[in-house]
Amino acid sequence: VCMTENIKTDISCVIVLDTFTDIADKIQKISISLFHIEIEDALKEVQSLSDDCMDWLNRMIVSEGRREEAEKDIKIHIRQMADLCNEAPRLVDDRDIMAQGAIISSLFLSHLLRMQGKENCVLRSCNFLRLGVDRKPDMENSRKNVEELMKGLPDVPLYITQNALCMNVYNETCLLPHGGTDYYAALTGAVFHATEVVLYTSGGVLNGNIKMRQTHSITFGEA
């Protein structure tokens, strides 16, 4: 079920998005190759992901101008993955690779929504979500980061960010500890002072359609 048509723009909304399964599968293969220091294999998987992304865009976005803009945005993160593989394969953290895949997923949804006339902005969760020294979410600093971030953002009804990714006190990419989708989404919503979270499960980018299904909505007390 493609849910993008059901995403409304009459109220301000923050979409907390999982990495699409097709992309996550590719990211896992890249990470496995890097773990074994098989750089050539890792780069082949990066190229395979790039080819798939271009194919999906050709299927999804009919406007040539919009498609070219989407390709440009996504290729930036493909190149960053390739650079990580080439420059420091023994030092690269697979969470940095995961972060690139998550951003690419957000960009896919962003450009598809724009094609439907729904203006939006992609926010990198690592730019505002922080863990404290106790490895628990630092809500005070996260809220401050959001306030600063929003000052320079366009006034749009939809914001898209990534699920579970954040930064620790050492400015390293990491994952929010514990919890599940309800918790992660509610945490992000709390940072934005939202009153309700609508949860979606995300599938893949298959046959030119983003697969998402709305499961339920929850208040922060329920989460």
PLM ranges: what are they?
Residues 1-223:
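Nucleotide/pyrophosphate-binding catalytic subdomain
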